[in-house]
Amino acid sequence: MKTINIWRFATILFLSLTAIPVCGETVEEMPRFPGGDQALMEFIENNLHCPQKMLRIGANGRVIVSFVVEKDGSITEPKVVKTTLKYKSGKPYEDTRIIKQCEEEALRIVKMMPRWIPGKQCGVPVRVKYHVPFKFNQTKPKSRWEK
């Protein structure tokens, strides 16, 4: 009888332990740019420069950059995930020099970013992969004083 109770206790304990989610599978608290999403958008807007040729012809597009927000909030491993540039008509823009300039500009901005507030799992700071889209859609050069 005593042996059966021990086995029951062990089985219940085992089942309850395996039902606990493992830390690291999902992030309870995503990393945040200091000041929040609005501050991130302003940071990008104030620092992003479109290639002049792209502005002249009215092309627009998007570059998606991924990076890792480390436990201390620093940014590492920035890389371009996807680039889409188009003419106003919707036709794909295929000038590889301009595409490369847009990608380099997006990476430059990521490398300029201040430390983020790190993501947390189970109350502990963790490394988190993050994606940010950079929109290149200005139709005219923007003055630094224009808002």
Residue ranges: model-predicted function:
Residues 2-11, 15, 19-147:
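Charge-biased low-complexity segments
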